[in-house]
Structures are given as C-alpha cells and as structure tokens.
Amino acid sequence: MVQSKTNTKGWVRYMRVLVACEESQVVTIELRRLGHEAYSCDLMECSGGHPEWHIQGDCLPLINGYCGFYTCDGLFHEVGSKWDMLIAFPPCTYLTAASAVRLRPGGILDPGRYEQLLDAACFLRLFFLLIVIELRLKILFR
C-alpha cells in the first residue's frame, strides 16, 4: 500500500485516489503508473484488466473515505481517512444537453430513457449532497 508522502514543499506526492464511475480504468492505470494508490469504482466490471484495483459496486458509501471495501480480486482494503483525491465521471450519457435530443425521438417522449435520466440526476444529486455535507461538517467542527 502506498502511503501519502510529502515533498520538501509540503505537497502531497503519493495520494489515495477514488476514481468513481470508471469501468475502463484508464485514469486509474495512469494514476497507478505515477505511484498513487488509485482505485476505480463502477457498477460494471472493469475492462482495464486490473481487477485488483477495481471496486464493483456503488461509490456513494465510499466517497468520504473512512471505509472498507473489496476489490474484484477478493481482497479487503481499508481507508482509515478521507481520500486525498476524488475523481468522478457521472453517467453523462443521460445528463448532457446532447442526450436531451434522444429523449424525444420523433417528438415522442421515450419513457425508458426518461427514467434513466431521472436515475442519473438523482445519483448526481446524492453524490454532490454527500460532498457538501462533508464540507459543511468540516466548517462547523473546525
């Protein structure tokens, strides 16, 4: 396990990083190459070839750190503090303006796509709500 280390200027050089909503592991692999302890997390299996760095499941219980999880290779990992960095790729397939065009093909609302849009928006709202709550608690209890 890589420990967080600082250089002579006090900057963190090696970090614990959660890359949420990433099944491809492109970012996770690059962060690992740079020496960081990075984990990808997605509801789907990873396609990047490193199950030892992938958490298959919901990222919401993990985003504030202080958690334990199993990677896809079956090993248990524990994060005893906050993540040093959080990177997230929410499901933009249903959240972008470009996706709105596909919401009403032929002028008729696609109920399946609309439901996926609502699910993605709810997930994104919960994701940011958890981060905001964490920041407010940090300010309150300084």
Tell me the role of every PLM-derived stretch.
Residues 1-142:
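Conserved active-site and SAM-binding loop architecture
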